[in-house]
Regions:
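Small/aliphatic-rich secondary-structure junction motif
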Residues: 2-56, 85, 102, 133
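Structural beta-alpha unit
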Residues: 13, 27, 75-109, 145-147
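General small-molecule cofactor/ligand-binding pocket signal
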Residues: 33-35, 87-91, 139-141
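Short secondary-structure boundary segments
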Residues: 36, 112-114, 142-143
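Glycine-rich, Arg-bearing micro-motifs that act as flexible, cationic patches
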Residues: 108-132, 147
Length: 147
């Protein structure tokens, strides 16, 4: 079965990309992986007294929050439609690295374009990095699903 990986960050652009991917997967008989990458913030260490941190608890909390975000997006976009298997996945990694890693096992990588124009390109957008370095074809979805 073909696999389509979609980058999810909670934005309208990523929701529209997921809508497109789900419809494409329905036509092609593919499965969809909705992938959200997150980075855990590093606690600031200073010289003053501090409350002990529950690092394992924080790790779990960040993961659960990330998984909740991508699951909520999948629920919003797909709803109760059972025609396509959509798996929400959260990974601790930078978005670019997570998507590039996932592209190695995918038939298509779909990312939304936030439309930042030239400034986004100069700063190195995730979409641009994926288009240049992914191991599979990349579709950069611009605009709404009707476009």
């Amino acid at each position: 079965m073909e696999k389509i990986v979609v980058g999810i960050d909670g934005s309208e652009a990523s929701k529209n990309a997921l809508r497109w991917a789900v419809e494409d997967a329905r036509v092609r008989g593919a499965e969809v992986i909705a992938l959200h990458a997150y980075e855990e913030p590093m606690p600031a260490l200073d010289a003053g007294p501090a409350t002990p941190l529950d690092l394992p608890g924080l790790v779990t909390e960040f993961y659960e929050g990330a998984l909740r975000l991508v699951s909520d997006v999948v629920d919003e976009v797909v709803g109760n439609a059972v025609t396509v298997n959509v798996a929400p996945i959260a990974v601790e990694e930078t978005p670019t690295k997570a998507l590039l890693d996932a592209s190695r096992d995918a038939d298509l990588l779909v990312v939304g374009s936030h439309g930042h124009g030239l400034s986004g390109l100069l700063l190195g957008s995730v979409s641009l990095e994926c288009a240049q370095h992914a191991a599979c074809p990349v579709l950069i979805h611009r605009g709404s699903t009707s476009q």
